């Protein structure tokens, strides 16, 4: 009985392939005049399912992710709490160490700079850990950075005694202040006629006009 069923289904399949699924026998809204490979695979899979020899269809989420539309976002990352790692969540989480080698691995306290080497922004005072009334000079900035290199907050705690921003500020406070310029030096001197700004009207010198 089973052999007759198989032979009948195979003969029907061959008959269908010979006539290439003619619209006179059936209707396909996508390709009415030609059989697609997808239709053939779907038909063969149906025959194999009825015969009991079809393999179960396995779907992978990684392949399905390509079909997502619209804005997508990924949350989580290093040091952002526990994450669901792996398809079954069986990959352990590893907390990243964000401190230096010589700093105690204690996240309960802030392990930032002992004295932040930055001037106070608007609305901040020395109580916020910044430097008030910092001179706006290149010399002060240069000295500030040179003195800052004497102390590495991550690996050089013994160098803490060398860092003293109050003495540095007192040292630089007596220096010359930056003079304000009321004249732009770039606008002085003879104008170059061959330099034309973008989107400007071409300017011809008097010599070119006389030559014409």
Swiss-Prot record:
What name does this protein carry? Answer: Neuroendocrine protein 7B2
Question: Which family is this sequence assigned to?
Answer: Belongs to the 7B2 family.
| Chain intervals for the UniProt region annotation (Disordered) | 171-212
Which cellular components does GO assign to this protein?
extracellular region; nucleus; secretory granule
Note whether Secreted occurs among the keywords.
yes
Specify the taxonomic lineage.
Eukaryota, Metazoa, Chordata, Craniata, Vertebrata
PTM summary: Proteolytically cleaved in the Golgi by a furin-like convertase to generate bioactive peptides.
Query: What Pfam families does the database record attribute to this sequence?
Result: Secretogranin_V (PF05281)
Q: Effect of gene disruption?
A: Mice have no demonstrable Pcsk2/Pc2 activity, are deficient in processing islet hormones, and display hypoglycemia, hyperproinsulinemia and hypoglucagonemia, similar to Pcsk2 null mice. In contrast to Pcsk2 null mice, they develop Cushing's disease due to excessive secretion of corticotropin from the pituitary and die before 9 weeks, indicating a role for Sgne1 in control of peptide secretion from the pituitary.
């Amino acid at each position: 009985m089973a052999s007759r069923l198989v032979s009948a289904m195979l003969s029907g399949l061959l008959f269908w392939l010979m006539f290439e699924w003619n619209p006179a026998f059936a209707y396909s809204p996508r390709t009415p005049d030609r059989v697609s490979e997808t239709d053939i695979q779907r038909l063969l899979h149906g025959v194999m399912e009825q015969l009991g020899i079809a393999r179960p269809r396995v779907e992978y989420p990684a392949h399905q992710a390509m079909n997502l539309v619209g804005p997508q976002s990924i949350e989580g990352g290093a040091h952002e709490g526990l994450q669901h790692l792996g398809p079954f969540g069986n990959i352990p989480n590893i907390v990243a160490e964000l401190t230096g080698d010589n700093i105690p691995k204690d996240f309960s306290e802030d392990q930032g700079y002992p004295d932040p080497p930055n001037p106070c922004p608007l609305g901040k005072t020395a109580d916020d850990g910044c430097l008030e009334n910092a001179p706006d000079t290149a010399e002060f900035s240069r000295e500030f950075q040179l003195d800052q290199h004497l102390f590495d907050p991550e690996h050089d705690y013994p160098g803490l005694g060398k860092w003293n921003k109050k003495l540095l500020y007192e040292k630089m406070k007596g220096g010359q202040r930056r003079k304000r310029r009321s004249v732009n030096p770039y606008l002085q001197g003879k104008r170059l006629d061959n330099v034309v700004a973008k989107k400007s009207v071409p300017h011809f010198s008097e010599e070119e006009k006389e030559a014409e």
